[in-house]
Amino acid sequence: MRGTDKQQSGMFSELSPEERVPEKHPLRAIRGMTDEVLKGLWAKFNELYSITGRPSIAPEKLLRALLLQILYTVRSERLLMEQLQYNLLFRWFVGLNMDEPVWVATVFSKNRDRLLEGEIARLFFAGVLEQARSADLLSDEHFSVDGTLMEAWAGQKSFQRKDGSEKPPPDEAGNPTVDFHGEKRSNETHESTTDADARLARKSGGHEAKLAYCGNVLIENRNGLVVDAELLQANGTAERDAALLMAERMEGSQRVTVAADKGYDTQELVREMRGMNVTPHVAQNDHRRGGSAMDGRTTRQPGYKVSQVKRKRIEEVFGWLKTVGMLPKTRPGGVHTVGWVFTFAAAAYHLVRMRNLLYMPVQSV
């Protein structure tokens, strides 16, 4: 018997959002790990908020929503609020009831800015990392480091002289034509009027220079999990500076290895890392003036060759951050804000990897 095409929707439902989400849905495991981290941030949240006044958006719900925005590549807060209106899965993950109103996008953004003022992203990342350590997913001996350029949300037309020298009036007020030919532009004489912290940089000689930041991650070599993240202004030494910063923050007193590409093959970096009880497994740059800083004491070891293979897994992290994690371009706001988003996106990647390692069924051959 053919069913009727009824258009009248029911007024009531006896099923909760919890019951509608499949037991094996990937977000179930991710939400469980996220909630565990948020419990540990309760005291820190109390420090950020006043005990009087109107209640804000709960920081726990705010962070869950921001996590969804990264995991599902929702390009703006306005679209995220739209999704929360009708997407049952999103409502369940954030913790909204079926009839609970969704926040106005501008209110959501204002509340998000409060979290940007604190080190919440760094603390959230540390909480996720501690779960991975408790599950014995992290190597405490072998690591890899690398950096990549994160294109800033600023156009070339915004890169103007710092001295404000006179320029001819624009031919079109909204989108003026700008001719850069014959003009020498550098970070010493110019800066972006859109994002003053962005720097003109290029990854290598064959690429065009863009306004960008330098995003750096340190991964452990067992499962390719991110153990530290650092975003700096893009300059000639940003990758090496970040590598030393992250090496200095590493826990434990035992000697460890850190693999890196040829760009890190300098006498200064190798010397400073060895002084931190770190054995650098840096790819040799024999074309460098003075030769490679790496000698046979390190390169003849079997572990050195293994590190050179393992370090390439770091590209998986950058690939995810620049596609799923919405970081092919950063958002305006300066190095602090962009660094906050970069660290939080690295934590999101970490949650996805942990879910795959801990909860994915093993395929039998």
Task: Mark where each language-model region is.
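Charged, often Cys/His-bearing segments associated with DNA-binding zinc-finger transcription factors
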Residues: 1-36, 176-180, 354-365
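Basic, low-complexity intrinsically disordered segments
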Residues: 2-5, 9-11, 15, 30-137, ...
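Short acidic (Asp/Glu) and glycine-rich catalytic loops that position anionic groups and cofactors
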Residues: 8-13, 41-45, 106-108, 194, ...
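Secondary-structure capping and boundary motifs in well-ordered enzyme cores
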Residues: 22, 26, 53-61, 72, ...
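Short, well-ordered loop/turn and helix-capping segments at boundaries between secondary-structure elements
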Residues: 71, 86, 90, 219, ...
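Polybasic low-complexity intrinsically disordered regions
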Residues: 82-85, 94-276, 285, 355
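Helix-centered, glycine/charged polyanion-binding patches within enzymatic domains
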Residues: 164-168, 178, 185, 262-336, ...
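In a subset of proteins, long, contiguous C-terminal domains/tails are tracked
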Residues: 337-365
